[in-house]
A protein has these predicted regions:
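Active-site-adjacent structural segments surrounding the nucleophilic cysteine of cysteine proteases
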Residues: 1-118, 239-245
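Conserved active-site-adjacent core of cysteine acyl-enzyme catalytic domains
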Residues: 5-8, 90-244
């Protein structure tokens, strides 16, 4: 067969490809670039902490005693979904680890996050501030008018924190006023994403249609999702490492 010059692939790999193989790569170039940008990882590498005391009481994987932490008249299990998502991203991509409670304490230290009995959940601005101090390239977005734009963003991202509500669409999430979840590992062949849902131990760590997520984005919120596209160890001001809870 006719050979083409050495071609650089993702992860710094070089190889020589024949014409047919090269054509396959050209056809799937966008998919390969997205995989390279994410970095090589699969479901087994993804952290997916649970927030609730019921999961902890049942001894569920990914649950922890942070669910019973009491903060200003509110239990972590009632408001900790966003912090679980942030801890998931930090522990999956930084080479370090933290618990959701560690993330709570750090967010209180370095951002304007001030939980109250009425509102305990972390807001978008504080989430972005904390993730950037953790070394991540993080940006906030509003829901695009077309699904394809959202899909392309998710495809190329390392991970996404999304805010969903059953008031916008209840195909998947039921009786949910507002809830943060993580999505990652977009699958081109099925148009699905890997879901880390802090409030659903049975639905946690499953693939679901990305369209469900798009339709359920909470549109009354100022923002609907936070995209994480990169990580820099040098920019990580925290370097927390270890999960004690």
């Amino acid at each position: 067969p006719e050979y083409v010059p050495a071609v650089r692939l993702y992860a710094g790999i070089f190889t020589k490809l024949d014409g047919e193989e090269y054509a396959v790569i050209e056809k799937n170039k966008d998919i390969l670039v997205a995989a390279a940008n994410r970095g090589y990882f699969d479901e087994s590498d993804v952290y997916s902490f649970l927030q609730g005391p019921k999961s902890w009481g049942e001894g569920r994987a990914w649950s922890g005693e942070w669910s019973n932490q009491y903060v200003r008249g509110n239990y972590f299990g009632n408001f900790g979904c966003g912090l679980c998502c942030m801890a998931n991203i930090y522990s999956t991509f930084s080479g370090h680890t933290c618990s959701p409670w560690d993330m709570f304490l750090y967010a209180r230290e370095v951002s304007g996050y001030t939980p109250t009995k009425k509102i305990g959940a972390i807001g978008w601005g504080d989430m972005k501030t904390v993730m950037r101090k953790c070394g991540f390239d993080a940006e906030l977005y509003t829901k695009p008018q077309d699904y394809e734009t959202f899909r392309d963003q998710v495809r190329s991202a390392k991970s996404v924190v999304v805010l969903v509500s059953s008031h916008d669409d209840n195909t998947y999430w039921k009786k949910t006023g507002g809830h943060y979840v993580n999505i990652s590992l977009y699958k081109e062949d099925t148009d699905e994403v890997f879901l880390a849902d802090p409030a659903d131990p049975d639905g946690n760590r499953n693939y679901i249609p990305l369209r469900y997520v798009y339709d359920a984005l909470k549109t009354v919120s100022k923002y609907q999702y936070l995209l994480v596209n990169g990580y820099s160890e040098e920019q990580n001001q925290w370097k927390q490492d270890g999960i004690d809870e």
